[in-house]
Amino acid sequence: MKVYNTLTNKKEEFLTLVPGEVKMYVCGPTVYNFFHIGNARTFVVFDTIRRYLEYRGYKVKFIQNFTDIDDKMIKRANEEGSTVKELGDRFIKEYYKDADDLNIERATKNPRATEFMEEIIKFVSDLIEKGYAYEIDGDVYFSTKKFNSYGKLSGQNLEELQLGARINVDERKKDPMDFAIWKSQKPGEPAWESPWGMGRPGWHIECSCMAYNLLGETIDIHAGGSDLSFPHHENEIAQSEARTGKQFAKYWLHSAFVNVNNQKMSKSLNNFFTAREILEKYDADVLRMFMLSGHYRTQINFSMELLDSTKAALDRLYNSINNLENLLDEVKNEELRDEELEYKNELQKYKEKYIEKMDDDFNTADAISVIFDLIRDVNTNVTIESSKELVKYTLDLIRELGNPLGILQESTKASLEEEIEKLIEERQKARKEKNWALADKIRDNLKERGIVLEDTPQGVRWKQI
């Protein structure tokens, strides 16, 4: 298995610190709002990577944190007249709802930064003691010049950063690139007691501390969105390695942005969507398959038209699964016949190809193509004459390959019938209202999905083709 390591900017053989085990840390949400589709891609991508590692036999300890104290949270809490804790509690609950709806598996642990104050204060104290941090008026800063390899993850040059970085320059700092690891209390902000007075941690130190306390000095994978590479992940490396003298993370994985209608997503452009808004209109399978239809390191473009195309493609897959489920009830031959054994063995090539694609830096786009190829093959060769054992094997294989991607796990019968009956009702209503364009559109859309309507004296009937 090979993974692309942002730290070295190349694909590397994936060799874990302990054979068969993976320690993985993913930067989670700041819990002051619902997560948007850009966040959703990050969560889906690393959920998929975790699932695939487990599919390949690894025992994965998967930590994804909640940032439940930072400037955005304080601002939002003050605006709505709540406490930061109340705000965090509320949006952690909302996160779990949306993540569950998106079929994201629960982490081994979702630590909250505020649960680790004692450990964070110890972390900061150790950095001061080792000469990597200094205190001024209750604020503690990390000295970037003291850490010789600062910039190794992002490829940034410290001198160039000092000249051109858009940072808040604090004249009290020894160097413009030094960053806060402990912030003194300001009016209206929550604070904790520390050796430097009342205050709260900086964002970067929170993740370093949680990773250290839950996974140890060195971890296998640290992951997050590409926007976190600098300064967040760069600063995590500096703090962690300055404290322990050991490599913080062996492999760094970063997922790319989601653009909306070929533009960067922003509220000012009115192209900002939360995952919840999309999940009200589309099933989780659709959104997951869309998010995984491009390589995780490549930006993807989001639009409703592309989601509709993904839904149509997914419907074709589910139609095939539905046909296999029906065959399972209808076929009369129970056991695998001799002539079917060779075909069953041939189907293994799809599993091997799928693993080959996913082993190459988790190429989900090509893995999905392999599933389509498998289903095309099965549609042609598995029929009413096949044995029940072969039909069941093909169904199980399709679901097996879909599982690491978090798709194709639903039983199709009830949900498909319910959806089609609902669309038939909408078409009948349109016909009564003489809205022929809408009626024809519904009929044509169903036909594209392999569903043919027949108008009979007894009413509308449908069948799959």
UniProtKB/Swiss-Prot annotation:
Any Pfam family: CysS_C
Subcellular location: Cytoplasm
Assigned EC number: 6.1.1.16
Keyword tags: Aminoacyl-tRNA synthetase, ATP-binding, Cytoplasm, Ligase, Metal-binding, Nucleotide-binding, Protein biosynthesis, Zinc
Positions occupied by motif 'HIGH' region: 29-39
GO molecular function, one term: zinc ion binding
Record-annotated membrane-spanning stretches: none
Cofactor note: Binds 1 zinc ion per subunit.
PANTHER family: CYSTEINE--TRNA LIGASE, CYTOPLASMIC (PTHR10890:SF3), CYSTEINYL-TRNA SYNTHETASE (PTHR10890)
Family affiliation: Belongs to the class-I aminoacyl-tRNA synthetase family.
Protein name: Cysteine--tRNA ligase
